[in-house]
Amino acid sequence: MKNFVSILSIFIIVSCSSGKTPVEEGLESQILHWGNGSEPQGIDPHIVTGVPEHHILIGVCEGLTITDPKGGRENLPGVAESWTLKEDQKTYVFNFNPNARWSNGDRVTPEDFVWSWQRALTPTLGSQYSEMLFYVKNAKKFYDGEINDFSEVGVKAISDYELEVELENQTPFFVGLLAHYSTWPVHKETVLKFGEMDDRSMKWTRPGNHVCNGPMKLKSWELNKKIVVEKNEFYWDADRVKLNEIHYYPIQNESTEDRMFRAGALHVTNVVPQEKCPVYLENKNPSLRIDPYMGTYYYRVNTTLPHLSDSRVRKALAMGINRKLIVEKVSKCGQKTAYSFTPPGTSEYYPDTVVEFNPEKAKELLTEAGYPDGDGFPTIEILFNTQEGHRKIAEAIQQMWKVNLGINVEIYNTDWKVYLSRQDNLDYQISRAGWIGDYQDPNTFLEIMRPGRGNNQTGWVNYEYERLVAEANKTSDQEERYKKLMEAERILIDEMPLIPIYTYVKQFQIHPDVKGWDANILDHHHPKFVYLERD
């Protein structure tokens, strides 16, 4: 809490000394002030995994394509100014923009992507998103050590301005996933200047060292206070970029962020305090935005623990949660109850799974598993990253499991980096989680629960599930594909290594000076489309 108070104090001092708030000064100088939730894990696109990191990376780096800021299904040019799909329907040729540059002025080349993808697929780097590239021919074989020569992987620079990518199978969502930061390039010379290819220290990403290719570039980073990026004069589309700087603030306390917004310290908040959302809705607060968001709020279950290894126990926990009560009385900001992992309507995919609130059935399942009325069941812990909203939901579920199942629950919060580390190492029992789609396709959800995937983080393995998802991604027939994905989703919900709670909406506050911040279900806001202007 001290950190949040100090951040707010800085704004008060600045406002008093100049007579203007940061928002007012930002309008004059095109500086956007953005509440960014947690202190980022880092900004190495091949290592990080979170939303706070994405918000910064989308400014300082760029991939072959970018998402449509208005929410369209088709991606827009990034480093690649165009691309073609060959007759085999699984080989792409990406034509590079000759003006694409790194922030030090070097040209961005197809070879940069070849090296970067090799890095992302190097097992010792430990990328949790390496599977994003497994659709490329032989990429998984290289990652698994079945082949050692990266030239056998289906990504090649076929000229100074052309990159050829051959896939294992027809993959209709491939161009879409290229807008995800895990597929973006890193500057080889800079990475190797500060370590080896697989060095996870991220020294190359520090201010003064960092080189990337986005519309902005890293200017400064004050730990737990502020990250500043500034306009990159070498960006190929720099003439379109109106913002001169973006200031990102790691504000975990929702009430503090709300006060900062109302004090004129922020243009955009990360969230809205749960207790404030219904008030703002009733008062028709013009700053409140509730946008569609392709994501699911859920609880991970560590299936490697003896008392949580039985699917009957996991289903009992799921049936002991009253989701309707949570969205109506706890989150209270337009969220929808979730009965599947994949949000209904994701690219016209509608799961038919059901997770009923049924305490009696839940008790029966616990009894079958050897825990009648919860007797003998160990006290379990719910882990969540520090945020008021997560705490309130955890407290509600703690009470529900005690009353409905007779189970004792402790709740434990920690900062973002420790929270991520504990999930990576399966050092938890039940963990708060959220998954936001990386591209517009149901595969972006179901893919992560395949065995061995870096974002599975539950220890759950089901080879029938693996077979169905793998087979779904070998066909371009959408009806057949969705049928197999639906079968996989049913297995996932029946086994319950994760417990869906609600489907997200993106609730936040935004100042009317901010333009170009269009609603889109991936919540991607590319800085070159955002600017400040008063009506």
Locate predicted features.
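N-terminal lobe/hinge region of extracytoplasmic solute-binding protein
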Residues: 35-87, 209-212
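Extracellular/periplasmic solute-recognition and catalytic clefts
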Residues: 219-230, 247-305, 328
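Aromatic- and charge-enriched surface segment that lines or borders ligand/interaction sites
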Residues: 82-131, 164, 307
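Detector for C-terminal structural segments
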Residues: 172, 222, 320-349, 388-398, ...
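Append "and occasionally in soluble cytosolic enzymes with long acidic Gly/Pro-rich linkers
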Residues: 230-231, 308-399, 403, 487
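Surface-exposed binding/hinge segments that line
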Residues: 95, 114, 121, 125-193
